[in-house]
Structure formats: structure tokens, C-alpha cells
Design a protein with these regions (language model features):
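Core beta-strand elements of the Rossmann-like FAD/NAD(P) dinucleotide-binding domain
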Residues: 200-203
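N-terminal Rossmann-fold NAD(P) dinucleotide-binding loop
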Residues: 17
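A conserved short coil-to-beta-strand element within the FAD-binding core of flavoproteins
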Residues: 177-196
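A short, Lys/Arg-enriched amphipathic alpha-helix followed by its capping loop at the start of a domain
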Residues: 20-31, 57-60, 173
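Short beta-strand to alpha-helix junction loop
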Residues: 149-169, 178-181
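Dinucleotide-binding Rossmann-like beta1-alpha1 core, especially the glycine-rich loop
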Residues: 42, 46-135
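Glycine-rich FAD pyrophosphate-binding loop
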Residues: 25-46
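Beta1/beta-strand and adjacent pyrophosphate-binding region of the FAD-binding site
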Residues: 3-14
Length: 203
């Protein structure tokens, strides 16, 4: 391929498709980005959880956090709690907090934990976030700037509402072209690269 790419087609919507289209359009505004999705393929999933990296992704495509939270029924996610991780005893659990322990790059926290407090949970010894979660506290305060964090966080959200929210943002603010159609054929060039798509109603 020697010609510069000027047009990109994203096949498939949902959160993955619209995030891909949004990032391409936001970071490469000279490109013509089109998303093609079928009306006959429903969005999978209702609830969805993200890693903290989603905050950076939303920032990169120009989304305000308050708009995202209110329109996608989002709540903060500070980690994962695994119930009965080792056995079936009542109350036994394992926390995987999103906040990195302070100094983890410069010391062997595991060895220190085993020496100082082996009878306590690792997350409780090296990190405050499990206690924040157990107290049902948020990872930030109302006055904390959007996407900033006191403790690291991702989100729980409604996947269907998130996809619709992303679609509206990408089409209205990032000039992504939206085509609803079924793809019938993928056409490759002489080198095996995808050259074009054929659809039922748009050629």
C-alpha cells in the first residue's frame, strides 16, 4: 500500500465499534471515518464494567464525564471483589483494587506483607482502596475535577445506553458517517488488503 489512507470504515457498532470510530476521528481529523452497522444485530450485554483506562479514552474523544455518567447510568468502579475466592466459608473474599500500592515499584511488597502481617489480606495491608469500597465511599468528591481521582476508578454502565451515547457524540461532534446496512461481501485488493465492502442498500 503506497497511497495514503484517507477513508476508514469501522464495521460493527456497539461500544467497541463506536469507541474505535471516535478515537480515529478525534485523533485523525483529516480522515473520513464511517461506521457501518446492521439493524439486525442487537447490542450484546446490559451491564458492563470498565478498567480505569476508560477515563483517558473518554477524554481523548472529547466527552464530558458528567454527561457520560448521567446519560449512561454509570457508577464508579474501584476494583473487583471475588466472593468465596478460596473456599465457601461465609464472608471470605478477595479484593482486586484499581489503585496501585504506594511504592510498589521500589520494594517487594509481597515479602513485606508475609513478614509483617501474613494473617491479613494483601489488599488491606498495602492499599487503602478496599476500605474505601467496604465503607461504600466514592473515589472522588463533588469538587474533584472531571476524570481526576482520589483513588483510581473505572465505571459500571449500561452498555446499550453507552453505545447510543457514543454514536450521538461521534456523529454530531466528530463527523463520523453512520450507515445502517448489512454487509454482504468483503472485497480484497491484489495484495490481500481489504479494499471495500458491499452492502445490501448502499452498494
Amino acid at each position: 500500500m503506497t497511497k495514503p489512507i484517507t477513508k476508514i470504515v469501522v464495521l460493527g457498532g456497539g461500544t467497541a465499534g463506536w469507541l474505535s470510530a471516535g478515537l480515529l476521528a478525534a485523533e485523525h481529523p483529516h480522515l473520513n471515518v464511517t461506521l457501518v452497522e446492521s439493524a439486525n444485530v442487537p447490542i450484546l450485554g446490559v451491564g458492563e464494567g470498565t478498567w480505569p483506562s476508560m477515563r483517558n479514552t473518554l477524554q481523548r474523544i472529547g466527552i464530558k464525564e458528567i454527561d457520560f455518567i448521567t446519560q449512561c447510568d454509570a457508577s464508579f468502579k474501584q476494583g473487583s471483589k471475588f466472593i468465596n475466592w478460596r473456599n465457601l466459608s461465609e464472608g471470605e473474599n478477595y479484593y482486586h483494587p484499581f489503585m496501585n500500592p504506594q511504592g510498589y515499584e521500589h520494594t517487594n511488597l509481597h515479602a513485606s506483607w508475609q513478614r509483617i502481617a501474613p494473617d491479613q489480606k494483601f489488599a488491606d495491608v498495602v492499599n487503602m482502596q478496599s476500605f474505601v469500597c467496604q465503607a461504600a465511599l466514592a473515589p472522588k468528591q463533588l469538587q474533584t475535577p472531571e476524570y481526576a481521582a482520589v483513588t483510581n476508578y473505572g465505571y459500571h454502565l449500561d452498555a446499550g445506553k453507552f453505545a447510543e451515547f457514543l454514536k450521538n457524540h461521534c456523529v454530531k461532534n466528530l463527523n463520523v458517517t453512520h450507515i445502517i446496512d448489512d454487509v454482504t461481501e468483503v472485497i480484497n485488493d491484489e495484495h490481500g488488503y481489504i479494499a471495500s465492502l458491499k452492502t445490501n442498500n448502499n452498494g
